[in-house]
Design a protein with these regions (language model features):
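Glycine-rich, mobile lid/loop segments that gate access to catalytic sites or pores
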Residues: 110-201, 205
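N-terminal, positively charged regions that mediate nucleic acid binding
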Residues: 1-57
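Glycine-rich anion/phosphate-binding loop at the beta-strand->alpha-helix junction
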Residues: 13-19, 179-181, 186-295
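A short glycine/serine-rich beta->alpha loop
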Residues: 9-14, 115-127, 195-199, 254-260, ...
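Glycine-rich, N-terminal phosphate-binding loop and its surrounding beta-alpha-beta segment
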Residues: 42-100, 104-106
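Alpha-helical support elements that line or immediately flank enzyme active sites
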Residues: 19-31, 125-151, 203-211, 267-278, ...
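Internal helix-turn-beta structural module
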Residues: 9, 81, 278-337
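Short acidic, glycine/tyrosine-flanked loop/strand segments centered on an H-E-D-like triad
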Residues: 96-121, 288-304
Length: 337
């Protein structure tokens, strides 16, 4: 399925090297002012070709809005937007030679060889432009209700920190110069979500958020709060004791990342996602020619990110914006939306 959400539905379509890609955002409250300049700022944060740390593919990603906005305000109808693909180099791809760790083989099996896999087709990170657009709309709705979203890179390869630093950039550039790529971790913090947002089981915040984060190409791990670090602790260390502060129930610590039982507790929501090293690398790899059914080797050509993290920061923020707004529309917090 290409649609996410229950009360706020986000549908994304298109292929990396097709004429264009698009998104439909259905369920935005009517009467919400949308600053398109602010939307374009978010789009530029994700756009390729901005530095040596990213792919040199150049796309303007200026949205052609088809419906849902009139005089800068949401109408209550679905907001639909299209983005043209202007800088695709399809000659770089040979569909008969399977690219290791891409969707080439699995999509060929799933769709009987009919899928357009040039540049990754519908599996490409190119389509995250649509998610950023949707998230930019949701973000403005949330910010007017006091919800703030901010993400930063906290790991690239062996380098760590609170944001993209010199050591992390060196890891990326070293990988690129070696014809290779490197993995990363991004942390996102969402503040201002009231207690009581979320639900049971599949409607819980972890379930909702993990679902949309795993739709971002390259994401291989998601954790909340201390995440896997909780496995090393005892309950007395991991629990977040409650206290009263100015007449409000608050937690002394936030090891759970702002969620108890799938429902927000009023503390900052903290989530991290791990991104695999970009699968497209210029080093020789073993693979198979699916037409001749012979083993062969491949060096992936084309223009690719040596690390997914720099451009994935706004994508993660956008995903959280869509997920949080959907959950707030599906809870007692709807009164504040």
């Amino acid at each position: 399925m290409n649609t996410y959400g229950e009360y706020l539905k986000v549908t994304i379509f298109g292929e990396s090297h097709g004429p264009g890609i698009g998104v439909v955002v259905d369920g935005l409250p009517a009467g919400e002012a949308i600053d398109l300049d602010a939307v374009r700022i978010q789009m530029r944060r994700r756009a390729p070709g901005s530095s040596d740390l990213t792919t040199h593919r150049s796309e303007t990603d200026d949205p052609l809005i088809m419906s849902g906005l009139y005089r800068g305000v949401t109408t209550g109808a679905p907001v639909a937007a299209l983005f043209q693909n202007r800088d695709a180099h399809s000659s770089d791809y040979h569909p008969e030679v399977l690219r290791p760790s891409h969707a080439d083989y699995t999509a060929t099996v799933k769709f009987g060889g009919y899928a357009d896999l040039r540049g990754g087709g519908p599996f490409s990170g190119r389509l995250t432009a649509c998610m950023v657009f949707a998230g930019a709309l949701c973000r403005q709705v949330l910010e007017r209700r006091g919800v703030q979203i901010a993400a930063n890179v906290v790991r690239v390869g062996h380098a760590t920190g609170k944001e993209l630093n010199f050591e992390m950039k060196r890891e990326i550039l070293d990988a690129r110069s070696a014809g290779d790529s490197v993995g990363s971790v991004i942390e996102c913090v969402v503040t201002g979500i009231p207690a009581g947002v979320g639900g049971l089981m599949f409607g819980g915040m972890e379930s909702r958020i993990a679902s949309i984060l795993y739709a971002i190409p390259g994401v291989k791990g998601v954790e909340f709060g201390l995440g896997f670090g909780l496995a090393e602790l005892r309950g007395s260390e991991a629990n977040d004791p409650f206290v009263l502060k100015n007449g409000q129930v608050v937690a002394e610590t936030n090891n759970a990342g702002g969620i108890n039982g799938g429902i927000t507790n009023g503390m900052p929501l903290v989530v991290r996602m791990a991104l695999r090293p970009t699968a497209s690398i210029a080093r020789e790899q073993h693979t198979v020619n699916i037409q001749t059914m012979e083993e062969t080797t491949l060096r992936v050509t084309g223009r690719h990110d040596p690390c997914l993290a720099p451009r994935a920061i706004p994508v993660m923020e956008a995903a959280l914006a869509c997920s949080v707004l959907d959950a707030m529309l599906d809870s007692a917090a709807v009164a504040s939306v």
